[in-house]
């Protein structure tokens, strides 16, 4: 597996007044989640040789994630100031410079995943697009929209960047909030149809407490969310996306374009992802489950 995108440190301000720091970033969380689930993962990212960079490196190494490029493309490791509300939901303010040094192409990945800011924030996003264009076809491309309006906005230029990446993806995941922010003129079903029209074989939408849906040429499959006590929502979507990829890999469905998948398998894949995300939200910070916790 190859994951491409941002690493950062979440500086978390809790409703109680407590301040804590966790290594993370959408793409870093996906890489760590995949590695904890037992998948060999290489990660193309950027972080600096500073205190926060050391936190990121330790986070990746502890899970067994290997770097696919020299991360020293930036002078200061990115941070996200996350404020946690009483309901556990997080809002963010970012300090982020995104650049990417040359990425090792070997060993050839069966899947390439990109997401969030790394897929749309210049100048690094151009390198991500080049990489996806080169590897798609031989590798399954998965894309988690994970919009961050606080840093990118939701104007036509941002929507165009998201759509440019979606055109290269076999599977696109987005939350209902992502779809509403980027395409406010469309209802949820219309936004899903729009993404599928761009070329994605599958569009997965997570809807918080209302569960998740998988839409393809075969129709729509919906599963319920898992009820847990929420510590916070940091890393929940990242974990869900990683577990989707893990479940597809477990069934030998990665490597090239996604073909038709039966509803029974889709339910298993979505429930696996929901179970992983439920574990993550049950504990503070982006702390995805290990394989043994998924039993």
Question: What is the role of each PLM region?
Answer:
Residues 11, 39-121, 141:
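Conserved N-terminal subdomain of the carbohydrate kinase-like
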Residues 7, 145, 239:
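Active-site metal-binding loops of divalent metal-dependent hydrolases
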Residues 111-193, 210-211:
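Conserved beta-alpha-beta core of the PfkB/ribokinase-like small-molecule kinase fold
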Residues 1-15:
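Positively charged, low-complexity intrinsically disordered leader regions
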Residues 17-34:
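Short catalytic helix/loop segments, enriched in acidic residues and glycine
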Residues 31-40, 247-249:
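Alpha-helix C-terminal capping segments
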Residues 134, 184-295:
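Conserved phosphate-binding/catalytic region of the ribokinase-like
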Residues 104-106, 164-165, 196:
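Structural alpha-helical scaffold elements that stabilize or flank donor/cofactor-binding regions
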């Amino acid at each position: 597996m190859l994951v491409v995108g941002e690493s950062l440190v979440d500086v978390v301000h809790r409703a109680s007044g407590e301040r804590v720091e966790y290594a993370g970033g959408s793409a870093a969380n996906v890489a760590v989640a995949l590695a904890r689930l037992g998948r060999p993962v290489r990660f193309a990212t950027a972080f600096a040789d500073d205190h926060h960079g050391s936190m990121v490196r330790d986070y990746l190494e502890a899970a067994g994630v290997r770097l696919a490029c020299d991360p020293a493309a930036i002078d200061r490791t990115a941070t996200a100031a996350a404020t946690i509300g009483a309901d556990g939901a997080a809002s963010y303010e970012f300090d982020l410079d995104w650049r990417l040094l040359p990425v090792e192409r070997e060993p050839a990945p069966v899947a390439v995943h990109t997401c969030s800011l790394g897929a749309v924030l210049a100048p690094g996003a151009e390198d991500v697009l080049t990489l996806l264009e080169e590897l798609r076809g031989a590798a399954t491309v998965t894309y988690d929209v994970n919009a961050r309006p606080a840093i990118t906005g939701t104007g036509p230029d941002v929507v165009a960047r998201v759509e440019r990446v979606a055109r290269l993806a076999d599977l696109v995941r987005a939350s209902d909030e992502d779809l509403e922010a980027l395409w406010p003129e469309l209802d949820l079903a219309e936004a899903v149809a729009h993404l599928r029209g761009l070329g994605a074989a599958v569009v997965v939408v997570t809807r918080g407490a209302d569960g998740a849906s998988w839409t393809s040429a075969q129709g729509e499959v919906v599963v319920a969310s898992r009820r847990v006590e929420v510590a916070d929502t940091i890393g929940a979507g990242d974990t869900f996306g990683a577990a989707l990829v893990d479940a597809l890999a477990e069934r030998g469905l990665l490597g090239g374009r996604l073909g038709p998948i039966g509803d029974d398998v889709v339910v298993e894949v979505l429930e696996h992802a929901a179970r992983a995300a439920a574990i993550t939200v049950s504990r503070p910070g982006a702390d995805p489950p290990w394989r043994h916790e998924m039993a």
